[in-house]
UniProtKB/Swiss-Prot annotation:
PANTHER family: NICOTINAMIDE PHOSPHORIBOSYLTRANSFERASE. The keyword Transferase applies. Catalyzes the condensation of nicotinamide with 5-phosphoribosyl-1-pyrophosphate to yield nicotinamide mononucleotide, an intermediate in the biosynthesis of NAD. The keyword Iron does not apply. This is Nicotinamide phosphoribosyltransferase. Diphosphate binds at R210, H249, R310. It catalyses: beta-nicotinamide D-ribonucleotide + diphosphate = 5-phospho-alpha-D-ribose 1-diphosphate + nicotinamide + H(+). Pathway: Cofactor biosynthesis; NAD(+) biosynthesis; nicotinamide D-ribonucleotide from 5-phospho-alpha-D-ribose 1-diphosphate and nicotinamide: step 1/1. Keywords: Glycosyltransferase, Pyridine nucleotide biosynthesis, Transferase. NCBIfam families: PRK09198.1 (NF006629). Gene3D superfamilies: Aldolase class I.
Length: 450
């Protein structure tokens, strides 16, 4: 078990070394007459289908300041704490098998600590682009450079934080872009088929937490999702997170398959005045829709809130809505047809059917943008309003993202030598899509945060 002292050392090492290993050698590789560096974080948008992306200034600022302040505090601690200094040296020796490099870096960190104790902050200037719902790719998002007359031996700090900034920023901003894209799709079908659009805020529910790679990833995604929707099962995602009571298969199977009707009845009676979601495919969802639900119809109609039925398996192209539906052939019926048959619907002002308010559909099995679009289009062609369904969007959408989805990168774009700034730009002939921007940028939309 880790004691307090060991835990504190590990904490500081994470602040100091949250970077790719090669970053520690770059400070030894820049030209000796380097006076300053200027680097930029941007999204290239090379590989995805997106034409624009979402950028949240406040989130990026929070990350950057946490990273910078944590680094500063831990650098100062190295000078004060001999055990930490020794641990830092030992760690670098184990990674590089180079005692000279390890000792020199630790000494350099102690020298930096003296500077920080005197000046209270790193000799850097960081600017972050203001928030925007639709930025073009290759827009400068974060710029970092040394202060004027930065000590030459600290110039390396400009590029040192690339790794930790990217790893903490790309997922949130990418998930935000995806959530906004889905909301735009929901708005499109709502405007075409619904009388009002307020239901959209709860139409896309975050199911992703269990499929994310870590708690931190889940929280980044949840926070991004909650910028556009209020429905989320990630309780810790934000103060505006909302959910309802819902069963899972362990609940629906607890009484056994022979008592499935009893299970539904028990839950409907126990939570008669609360919104409730019940999963229906633990055994045979078609039996639930064709036999169990109609037997409980009066109980459902007497409830004080909506019952949402959730399918969790099957072919999505026949499950919710079947384009080959024939009224006389029950084998072609989908969920929407059964629920309309049992509970009826009304026609809204735009001529589309809206199910009885006591019943609804929620579907969250492997949901993607493409599946949502297909289902909403099928419902529309079938004469139904888009408000009849809620989607549970999980890791099939949010975990299947990576840094290249929007092409987030952090690159050196200018270097100061001989008292003159020179633009720096990479242009690999093997893949010109990876070309970087060059030079320094001035715009009022880049706000100084450090």
């Amino acid at each position: 078990m880790m004691d307090k002292r060991t835990s504190e050392i590990e904490f500081h090492l994470k602040n100091l070394l949250a970077c790719d290993a090669y970053k520690l050698s770059h400070r030894l590789m820049y030209p000796q007459d380097t006076q300053n560096l200027y680097s930029m974080l941007t999204a290239r948008g090379v590989y995805g289908d997106f034409k624009e992306f979402v950028w949240n200034h406040d989130f990026a600022k929070e990350i950057l300041l946490n990273v910078f302040n944590g680094f500063v505090n831990s650098v100062i601690e190295v000078k004060k704490n001999k055990l930490l200094a020794a641990a830092l040296t030992d760690k670098l020796v184990s990674v590089f098998n180079d005692h000279e490099l390890a000792n020199e870096f630790t000494q350099h960190i102690c020298h930096l600590a003296s500077f920080l104790e005197k000046n209270k902050k790193m000799p850097l200037v960081a600017k972050i682009h203001e928030s925007d719902q639709s930025l073009p790719f290759r827009t400068p998002l974060i710029t970092i450079e040394g202060v004027e007359n930065i000590p030459n031996n600290f110039v390396w700090l400009v590029n040192y934080f690339e790794t930790v900034l990217l790893e903490n920023i790309w997922l949130f901003q990418t998930a935000s872009t995806v959530a906004k894209r889905i909301k735009s799709l929901l708005e499109k079908y709502a405007k075409e088929t619904a009388d009002e659009t307020s239901f959209i805020n709860f139409q896309c529910h975050d199911f992703s937490m269990r499929g994310m790679s870590s708690l931190q990833s889940a929280l980044y995604v949840a926070r991004a999702h909650l910028q556009y929707f209020t429905g989320s099962d990630t309780i810790l995602g934000g103060d505006n997170s909302r959910s309802i009571l819902a069963s899972e298969h362990s609940v629906m199977c607890a009484d056994g398959s022979k008592h499935e009707l009893k299970t539904f009845q028990r839950l409907l009676e126990k939570f008669k005045d609360k919104k409730l979601s019940l999963v229906i495919d633990s055994y045979d969802m078609w039996n639930v829709l064709d036999n169990i639900i109609p037997r409980l119809k009066n109980l459902i109609l007497m409830r004080g809130a909506t019952l949402y039925l959730r399918a969790d398996s099957g072919n999505y192209q026949t499950l919710i809505c079947n384009p080959n539906y024939k009224k006389q052939d029950k084998s072609t019926w989908a969920m929407i047809d059964y629920l309309d048959h049992h509970f009826s619907s009304t026609i809204n002002k735009k001529g589309y059917k809206v199910l009885n308010k006591k019943i609804g559909i929620i579907y969250g099995d492997g949901i993607t943008y493409q599946k949502i679009e297909w289902i909403l289009n099928c419902l529309k062609n079938h004469g139904y309003c888009s408000s009849n369904i809620i989607f549970g969007v999980g890791s099939s959408t949010y975990q299947n993202l990576n840094r290249d989805t929007l092409g987030f990168v952090y690159k050196l774009t200018a270097i100061k030598r001989n008292n003159r700034w020179i633009g720096v730009k990479k242009t690999p002939i093997t893949d010109l899509s990876k070309s970087s921007k060059g030079g320094r940028y001035k715009t009022k939309r880049l706000i100084t945060v450090y």
